[in-house]
Amino acid sequence: MDGRIIKALSGYYYVDTGADIITCRARGKFRLDGTSPLVGDRVQLDVSPDGTGSVREILPRRNYFIRPAVANIDLMVMLAAAVNPVTDPFLIDRVSALAAHHSCDFLLCINKADLNPGDELFSIYSASGIPVVRTSAVTGEGLPELSERLAGRVCAFTGNSGVGKSSLLNALSPELSLLTGEVSQKLGRGRHTTRHVELFALENGGYVADTPGFGSFDIEQMESIRPAELQYCFPEFEPYLGSCRFTDCTHRNEPDCAVRAAADEGKIHPSRLDSYRRLWEQANRKKDWEV
């Protein structure tokens, strides 16, 4: 029997077979192999007469992320806001680069649009070839479009704490009843209300993963991207790659760099080029043999 792991907690794996949710343990061979089933994994399982199961095989993964530990994500939805707590564009760029590196589609969701539509963020990212949608859990703005983008796909939601992930998911599917947290007036950030990764089935045939806070996407995970690969994680760079004077151009300080020339002409936003440079420096700190 095949199914998808929708939750992993205290050594138990909850597998959705399409007909039922079966509570499973993992076979001992995974421990011996040093591998672990992840939320999102497609697995083969054996079911006992008492209705419990055991995970026998992990089917090939499309992708997987280290932190948060989740596999087979089709779409990464990054929630941002132009109001308290304001999202740093560098964090958006870091997550979008990770998504691209893992062959995962990326969607920027500017939430709390009823308070601030985030015109600058919308301008930067729509011009960069990144899909953007404005949403509000209060007014319902953008929810139909967001729901359409999630249909039939496994999607991970992330964003800095307090940006409204749980509230937005509740607005999309009220039956989820996810715990929400108010934004601290003193700290300017929200309390973490998501403690573990879990996939929630939607009526449109998709799944959403409400993942723990933004700190999960740490520098260690970014360093799995080698410096030479990073340029392919910025879609607006693509028309200019191969047009630099040097074939191994890093687009940082080499002469006759087509990417920097495009930025000078306003075809690439300065903040995106700056983020690329910062991420390149992070990736360059770890040598190839250390990855």
PLM feature spans:
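Structural detector for short beta-strands of small beta-barrel domains
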Residues: 1-9
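Short, Lys/Arg- and Gly-enriched loop/turn segments at beta-strand edges
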Residues: 50-58, 86-88
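Short aromatic-glycine-enriched beta-strand elements
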Residues: 11-15
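A conserved segment at the C-terminal end of the G1
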Residues: 165-181
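Canonical P-loop GTPase G-domain recognition
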Residues: 112-163
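Beta-strand/loop nucleic-acid-binding surfaces
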Residues: 21-37
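Helix-rich effector regions associated with P-loop NTPase G domains
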Residues: 34-49, 59-76, 81, 97-106, ...
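Phosphate-binding glycine-rich loops and their immediate beta-loop-alpha structural context
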Residues: 83-129
